[in-house]
């Protein structure tokens, strides 16, 4: 009945966030470990390899924020709130530009500053989207103390999300 639907939605929301965090952590470790190898495989010129490696390693430190934003924004959109994720992304984009200027011009941080600005902006968008879920009044309301892996929901998230994620990654690599 309706109670079962609510329960499944509630469990999906509370499985999605830990899944995003765990996925992000795994990708961060892989990225930090293999950034230079990936860049060499892509044919990055030796002249820019050191700076590219710095940039990529810093960016990989923020992958978890990106995963949290994407998972939670998808939940909001599925629940009918398409505006909030867009507003949060717009705010994060403006913040990114401002932080780029501050870190690069004011603090002379160059490539590291650009990467740091990006992950700070991603962190802000992730926090905003989590707060939006915590303020909901429906089955998508997020309670931090109820986060866990519910096996049926995790299986469905992985069954649907893993192929889509691999497809997106392959598309990004090919371009």
Language-model features: locations:
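Short, small-residue-biased leader/transition segments that mark boundaries at the very start
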Residues: 2-6
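Residue-level recognition of transmembrane alpha-helices
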Residues: 20, 56-59, 63, 89-93, ...
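Alpha-helical transmembrane segments of multi-pass membrane proteins
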Residues: 46-69
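Interhelical loop/hinge segments that connect adjacent transmembrane helices in multipass membrane
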Residues: 118, 129-172
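Membrane-interface helix-loop junctions in multi-pass transport and translocation proteins
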Residues: 93-127, 131
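Residues that define the loop-to-transmembrane-helix transition and helix capping
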Residues: 14, 82-83, 111-112
């Amino acid at each position: 009945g309706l109670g079962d639907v609510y329960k499944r939605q509630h469990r999906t929301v509370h499985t999605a966030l830990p899944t995003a965090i765990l996925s992000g952590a795994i990708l961060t470790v892989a990225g930090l470990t293999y950034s230079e190898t990936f860049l060499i495989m892509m044919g990055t010129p030796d002249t820019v390899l050191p700076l590219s490696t710095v940039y990529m390693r810093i960016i990989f430190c923020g992958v978890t924020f990106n995963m949290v934003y994407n998972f939670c924004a998808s939940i909001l959109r599925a629940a009918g709130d398409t505006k909030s994720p867009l507003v949060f992304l717009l705010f994060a984009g403006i913040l990114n530009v401002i932080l780029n200027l501050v870190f690069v011009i004011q603090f002379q941080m160059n490539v590291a500053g650009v990467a740091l600005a990006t992950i700070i902006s991603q962190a802000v968008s992730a926090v905003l989207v989590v707060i939006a879920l915590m303020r909901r009044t429906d089955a998508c309301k997020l309670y931090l103390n109820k986060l866990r892996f519910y096996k049926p929901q995790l299986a469905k998230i992985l069954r649907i999300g893993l192929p889509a994620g691999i497809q997106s990654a392959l598309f990004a690599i090919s371009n």
